[in-house]
Curated annotation (Swiss-Prot):
GO terms for biological process: maturation of SSU-rRNA. It comes from Listeria welshimeri serovar 6b (strain ATCC 35897 / DSM 20650 / CCUG 15529 / CIP 8149 / NCTC 11857 / SLCC 5334 / V8). One of its GO terms (molecular function) is ribosomal small subunit binding. Disulfide bonds: none annotated. It is found in: Cytoplasm. This is Ribosome-binding factor A.
Amino acid sequence: MNVRANRVSEQMKKELGDILNRKIKDPRLGFVTVTGVDVTGDLQEAKVFISILGTDKEKENTLLALAKAHGFIRSEIGRRIRLRKVPEMSFEIDNSIAYGNRIDELLRDLNSDQ
C-alpha cells in the first residue's frame, strides 16, 4: 500500500468509527469497533474490518444493518473525506481479538495448573 492509501485508510477508520457510533440509528446495529481498513492502491475498494460484541445472532444482525446502511455510510465518507471517488466498501468481521482472548485464556489455564 502506498503512502496516500495509508492516509486514506487511517482517515476512513476514524470517520467510520464516528459514523457507526453516532450517525446510524438502526437498533440491529450492536456494539461495533472498526479495527482496520485496507484500501487498494488505486483507492477504488476498501475492506473494513470490524469487531462486534455479542452473540452470533447479534453479529449477523449487525452485518445486515451495515449492508442496509451501506449507501448512507459511503455518502457520509464522501462528505468527510475529499476524494474524487469514494472507495467501494465491504465489511468483514475481525476475529483476531476473540482469537487473542482465547490464547490468553489458554495461557492462564496452563499457568494455573503449574
